[in-house]
């Protein structure tokens, strides 16, 4: 299509990529009207967050979409990194939140994405630190201990609250992965 009159009229410069500008303007409102995709490390996170949003913010629940993990999508922090890179590479335009656990694997995986040039519609974050995890019982090769597990062992279950995490008034300890009590 001839746009000479638009260039002559000052609406565009000769070097402007008019078709790219037009496409950007057309899709500009699309992401704001589409669901926000929430990506998590596993099915439990998605199920809990979906149910929590529906319970606490029912008027907002239709604004979010979760990865359908029933289709055998792999879980874990490493898999989430691959999914985020795939979304970026495929040009998925929905606003997307990649939510990692607040543990060692989650922080390590999220840091891998810091050097990746992600589009502005994708944000990467971890669950926040919580006061309950500042002094939490753990079980591992050095025996039972009480320490901060913020940043090292906070999966979504630690955000359920003290009442859910206790048995007979005692917090259920975090068992360090790979630790087998039988090998003491």
Please give the residue ranges for each predicted region.
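Acidic, divalent-metal-binding catalytic cores of TOPRIM
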Residues: 1-184
């Amino acid at each position: 299509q001839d746009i000479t009159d638009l260039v002559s009229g000052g609406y565009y410069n000769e070097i402007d990529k008019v078709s790219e500008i037009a496409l950007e303007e057309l899709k500009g409102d699309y992401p704001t009207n589409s669901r926000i995709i929430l990506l998590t490390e596993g099915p439990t996170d998605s199920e809990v967050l979906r149910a929590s949003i529906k319970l606490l913010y029912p008027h907002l629940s239709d604004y979010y979409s979760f990865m359908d993990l029933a289709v055998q999508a792999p879980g874990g922090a490493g898999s989430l990194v691959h999914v985020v890179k795939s979304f970026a590479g495929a040009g998925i335009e929905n606003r997307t939140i990649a939510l990692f656990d607040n543990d060692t694997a989650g922080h390590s995986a999220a840091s891998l994405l810091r050097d990746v040039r992600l589009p502005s519609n994708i944000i990467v974050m971890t669950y926040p630190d919580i006061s309950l995890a500042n002094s939490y019982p753990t079980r591992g090769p050095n025996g039972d201990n009480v320490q901060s597990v913020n940043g090292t062992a906070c999966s979504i279950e630690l955000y359920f609250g003290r009442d859910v995490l206790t048995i007979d008034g005692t917090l259920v300890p975090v068992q360090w992965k790979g630790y087998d009590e039988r090998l003491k």
